[in-house]
């Protein structure tokens, strides 16, 4: 334990890890979600988390080949984790607005829906849903 205290908070090994499952509203707490479902985001990616954290001024880097241990789906979409620096060399906070890992997760979940990639996807998806609803009129019960 003594050698763990000797390492600097600025080492990349000491950065906090954020997996997309922590912010996913499709996951239960048992499956790895760490924030309230009301604040969680639908299927966030590690790249989106990195973009949001980098935009606010945090020191981040993306590890694309890492996977969350509770994630059963092995698709490329679900891979990746983001490492975020919370503390500087002297132990003080990098940004005062992020005193804990939970504050970073809540901020990322709040900002991801505002990304341009998210707003463009939802705008096009609504039209396809409206067109598909008209074809369901012909279905009825089976006759015996």
Swiss-Prot record:
Disulfide bonds: none annotated. It is found in: Cytoplasm; Nucleus, Nucleolus; Nucleus, Nucleoplasm. InterPro entries: Signal_recog_particle_SRP19, SRP19-like_sf. One of its GO terms (biological process) is SRP-dependent cotranslational protein targeting to membrane, signal sequence recognition. Keywords: Cytoplasm, Nucleus, Ribonucleoprotein, RNA-binding, Signal recognition particle. GO terms for cellular component: cytosol; nuclear body; nucleolus; signal recognition particle, endoplasmic reticulum targeting. GO terms for molecular function: 7S RNA binding; ribosome binding. Pfam families: SRP19. Residues 117-144 are annotated as: Disordered. Component of the signal recognition particle (SRP) complex, a ribonucleoprotein complex that mediates the cotranslational targeting of secretory and membrane proteins to the endoplasmic reticulum (ER). Binds directly to 7SL RNA. Mediates binding of SRP54 to the SRP complex. Component of a signal recognition particle complex that consists of a 7SL RNA molecule of 300 nucleotides and six protein subunits: SRP72, SRP68, SRP54, SRP19, SRP14 and SRP9. Interacts with IPO5, IPO7, IPO8, KPNB1 and TNPO1. Interactions with IPO8 and TNPO1 may be involved in SRP19 import into the nucleus. Belongs to the SRP19 family. This is Signal recognition particle 19 kDa protein.
